[in-house]
Amino acid sequence: MECRSLDLTIISAEDLKDVQLIGKQDLYAVVSINGDARTKQKTKVDKDCGTKPKWKHQMKLTVDDAAARDNRLTLVFEIVADRPIAGDKPVGEVSVPVKELLDQNKGDEEKTVTYAVRLPNGKAKGSLKFSFKFGEKYTYGSSSGPHAPVPSAMDHKTMDQPVTAYPPGHGAPSAYPAPPAGPSSGYPPQGHDDKHDGVYGYPQQAGYPAGTGGYPPPGAYPQQGGYPGYPPQQQGGYPGYPPQGPYGYPQQGYPPQGPYGYPQQQAHGKPQKPKKHGKAGAGMGLGLGLGAGLLGGLLVGEAVSDIADMGDMGDMGDMGGFDF
């Protein structure tokens, strides 16, 4: 397959549509062959350019010479407004057949051309200026080529690439074999003795009957033996704590605890009488409160009586019964 390199310089644009409501718009251009995303290249963003961006951005593409001469390749220029907050918005587009450019090729000379910019509705608004130059033909894949071409840019046809796929429910094969079945650690299974080919474990302590778990059943602790290091219980004096029963039953030797707020029952002796200082304190407080209330009432009553007396004395003065 014979290919050519295509050198482009996106120079500038003029009289474009202004899609920015406030301030000047920022514009950039995207170049591709037939709009294929795999061939897209982008210019820098010209800040605050308004309707007259200037880029002077260089880029290189590779085209299939036979497809270009058969007019199957189109060079597409998309002018876009850069808007980080509201989202980028298309301003215009230019489509140029590669064959048209190839027919204007004159050796190593770079040619500058200007094309009309089309709005999304098809109307012309503004112009785009760029320069181009084609390289010499070379065979794709040959070491004598000027550079390694971009396969996706050589033709508008989709070049199928081998894709590794796996059926649903199966992942990619692993480079390591699956681990053997059985315990994941290097220890033998619990309860197995390699030497005697039997069951092994911790020796059961004296006084504990054999059980399914590693702990003796409740209430099976010996009263006189115990663990090493602890002396046996004394026979005289106060009795020690009785052995605990199963979980959920009251402890032996002690009465069950009553609800919260009630006095607890004593195990020995007569029940203690509640102290009287609480009632005495309550009675004293009640008496003080009543006394204070009575005293306040008396004071108020006396004040009212004094005011009434002063009013009566004023009336007597009006009678004029005395002369001075």
Swiss-Prot record:
Write out the GO cellular component annotations: endoplasmic reticulum; endoplasmic reticulum membrane; extracellular region; plasma membrane; protein storage vacuole; protein storage vacuole membrane
List, as start-end ranges, the regions of compositional bias called Basic residues. 270-279
Give me the ranges of the annotated region Disordered: 141-281
Record carries keyword Transmembrane: yes
Task: Explain the purpose of this protein.
Answer: May act as an activator of the calcium-dependent activation of RBOHF that mediates reactive oxygen species (ROS) production and may play a role in cold responses.
Which PANTHER family does this one have?
INGRESSION PROTEIN FIC1, PROTEIN SRC2 HOMOLOG
Identification of the protein by name = Protein SRC2 homolog
